[in-house]
């Protein structure tokens, strides 16, 4: 039931309806050879799970280590002396304060204060910023960035964008450091959460290793030359600790960690304040109010939002979007945006938006599932402890 439920949820929420014209990652043949069940996702063909199933894959990642194909993510390099000014004209984060090799999660916003995408931006030790965007937002993000870059250049600014041909793999789980250190010339203990380095990985040069991920575990994402991606993946999967993992495990892992999925939990109808992502707003940026939608966002900070993103736990049938969340009087107070049975906890977890008056952890609400009402408890996120390798 768990595995079938997660597969069905992925199909409903993220997958396109037809396989024609799908892009393939360099690891496509490897996935198929290892029993990956391929599905369409954001215009790409990607594995949803492997023969061992979603439950085993999820738990293996929590206990050991898994390899995820994230080649569908858009990777962009931003060059030029005005690259920081360019990016800060689009996002809410303090890019200027990033040290060489340091990155941050930030939000691309519009003039209404809505979230256009969530990005990871790294100030590389080289001469550029490295930006990773969601695959489903790739065309939109490119148009926004290229449009703004053209405006800056027309005004005499120096900025240039280069879409990277590199692909990417995520290595996630408590065994990651042991596995990866064997193939790195660098001391991995010096690479803390949200820092990045250009290096060679298991003999493959031209890689970028960033200590981050989408599971709540210690992990890295490796940007690798497309022509060497299979070689690197095979080296990693040659380690007994490393299993291949698919979209189903990635989704349940990120939900347990309380991480947002763009298009479900955040989109162009939500603001950073409503989403509980106020921490992404740099202190200097709040004062300067020089990012898109700043007036609206800072007004919400002052007056408090009318709705908030919350976590929910329940027993019984899984809570799936767009299930209605009901208050004590049986009136609608919100909507579920993500949900699945938690392999780690053995109960249902979900996130959604509710009226602010009903957002306090410990509040009992009701969720309507197949025309029946089931109790759900507002629960603090993350649902399971995270294990990021933080700087001491």
From Swiss-Prot:
Organism this protein belongs to: Gallus gallus (Chicken)
Catalyzed reactions: N(6)-[(R)-S(8)-aminomethyldihydrolipoyl]-L-lysyl-[protein] + (6S)-5,6,7,8-tetrahydrofolate = N(6)-[(R)-dihydrolipoyl]-L-lysyl-[protein] + (6R)-5,10-methylene-5,6,7,8-tetrahydrofolate + NH4(+)
Binding-site list for substrate: 221, 250, 388
Assigned GO CC terms: glycine cleavage complex; mitochondrion
Stated family: Belongs to the GcvT family.
Compartments (UniProt record): Mitochondrion
Annotated function: The glycine cleavage system catalyzes the degradation of glycine.
Disulfide bonds listed in the record: none
Assembly and oligomerization: The glycine cleavage system is composed of four proteins: P, T, L and H.
Transit peptide feature, positions: 1-16
NCBIfam families: gcvT, PRK00389.1
GO biological process, one term: glycine decarboxylation via glycine cleavage system
Enzyme class: transferase
Taxonomic path: Eukaryota, Metazoa, Chordata, Craniata, Vertebrata
Keyword terms: Aminotransferase, Mitochondrion, Transferase, Transit peptide
EC number, UniProt record: 2.1.2.10
Domain of life: Eukaryota
Pfam families the record matches: GCV_T, GCV_T_C
Record protein name field: Aminomethyltransferase, mitochondrial
Molecular function, one GO term: aminomethyltransferase activity
Residues spanning the membrane: none
């Amino acid at each position: 039931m768990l595995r079938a439920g997660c597969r069905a949820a992925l199909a409903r929420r993220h997958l396109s309806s037809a396989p024609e014209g799908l892009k393939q990652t360099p690891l496509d043949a490897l996935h198929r050879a290892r029993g990956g069940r391929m599905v369409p996702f954001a215009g790409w063909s990607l594995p949803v799970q492997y023969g061992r199933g979603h439950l085993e894959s999820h738990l293996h990642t929590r206990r050991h280590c898994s390899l995820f194909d994230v080649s569908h993510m858009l990777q962009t390099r931003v060059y030029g002396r005005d690259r920081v000014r360019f990016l800060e004209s689009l996002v809410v984060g303090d890019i200027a304060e990033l040290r060489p090799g340091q990155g941050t999660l930030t939000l691309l916003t519009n003039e209404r204060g809505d979230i256009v995408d969530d990005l990871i931006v790294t100030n590389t030790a080289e001469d550029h910023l490295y930006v990773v965007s969601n695959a489903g937002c790739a065309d939109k993000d490119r148009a926004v960035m290229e449009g703004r870059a053209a405006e800056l250049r027309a005004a005499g600014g120096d900025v240039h964008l280069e879409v990277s041909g590199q692909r990417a793999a995520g290595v996630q789980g408590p065994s990651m450091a042991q596995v990866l250190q064997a193939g790195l010339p660098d001391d991995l203990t010096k690479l803390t959460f949200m820092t990045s380095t250009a290096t060679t990985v298991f003999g493959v040069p031209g890689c970028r290793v960033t200590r981050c991920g989408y599971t709540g575990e210690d992990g890295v994402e490796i940007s690798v030359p497309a022509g060497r991606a299979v070689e690197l993946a095979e080296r990693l999967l040659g380690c007994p600790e490393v299993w291949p993992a698919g979209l189903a495990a990635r989704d349940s892992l990120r939900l347990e960690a309380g991480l947002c999925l763009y298009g479900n939990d955040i989109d162009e109808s939500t603001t950073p304040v409503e989403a509980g992502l106020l921490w992404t707003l740099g202190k200097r940026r709040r004062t300067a109010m020089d990012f898109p939608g700043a007036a609206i966002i800072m007004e919400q900070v002052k007056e408090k939002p009318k709705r908030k993103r919350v976590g929910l736990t329940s027993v019984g049938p899984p809570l799936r979007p767009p299930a209605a969340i009901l208050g004590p009087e049986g009136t609608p107070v919100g909507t579920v945006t993500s949900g699945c049975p938690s392999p780690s906890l053995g109960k249902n977890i979900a996130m959604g938006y509710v009226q602010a008056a009903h957002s306090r952890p410990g509040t009992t609400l009701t969720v309507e599932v197949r025309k029946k009402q089931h109790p759900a408890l507002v629960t603090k996120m993350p649902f399971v402890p995270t294990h990021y390798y933080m700087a001491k």
